[in-house]
Amino acid sequence: MFSASLLLAFSWASTGAPDVTLTAAFRETKPEALSSQHATLARDCESSKLAATCYHAALGSYLLALTNLQADKDAAANQLAQCGRFSALAGTQDTLKAEADALLSACYGLSIALNASKGMALGPASTTLLADAERLAPTSPRVHYFAAMRLFRTPKIWGGDPVKALAHAERALKLFEDSEANASGLAWGKPEVAHLIEQIKAEK
């Protein structure tokens, strides 16, 4: 048997894409592998301040927050705070700004889910971040994914719309086939979009 850390190292080296191995660890319910890779990325972001590394660290924080959302809300809140800090560092690079803004918008959404009292402040901020991301990168599949997620998870009274959510998700799926739409160098998201489409259709 190979250790989780060895398998993670092999996967990372094989794909060259930390975002892919992070999301794979999340989908496959491997919290130790996810935590291990995130810890490395977080340290590297803090020391190097490189935008791409900080984006991956922010993504890891977001995924860990999702993992802890029900079982350990304090841990989830801490990860969401980290997501905000790392996303801000990632947003300093033009090609990643839209991706970082969309991710930060999602982290704000989770923060509101954890503590509804934050909605007054973070709700408008989340909306603005996502609108900016859509304006800056209208062909980013991940931006459309987060737009779909927001519309699907938000109650209708607050602007949620499953029909528009499905349109964004289906647009995202098509954009994953377009190499120009992935100019940011990121590769994650296609399985997540496909799963979201299934969820939206199941609840229609």
Regions found by a protein language model. Give the residues of each.
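Terminal, low-structured helical/coil segments at or just beyond the last alpha-helical repeat
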Residues: 163-166, 171-204
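Surface-exposed, polar helix/loop patches in the mature regions of secreted/periplasmic/lumenal proteins
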Residues: 84-136
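Alpha-helical junction/boundary sensor with strong preference for TPR arrays
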Residues: 45-48, 87, 94, 130, ...
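Amphipathic alpha-helical repeat scaffolds of TPR domains
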Residues: 15-24, 47-68, 95-114, 139-155, ...
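Outer-membrane beta-barrel transmembrane domain signature
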Residues: 123, 127-131, 141-142, 149, ...
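Helix-turn-helix repeat elements of alpha-solenoid scaffolds
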Residues: 26-42, 73-86, 119-127, 165-173
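Sec-dependent N-terminal signal peptides
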Residues: 2-11
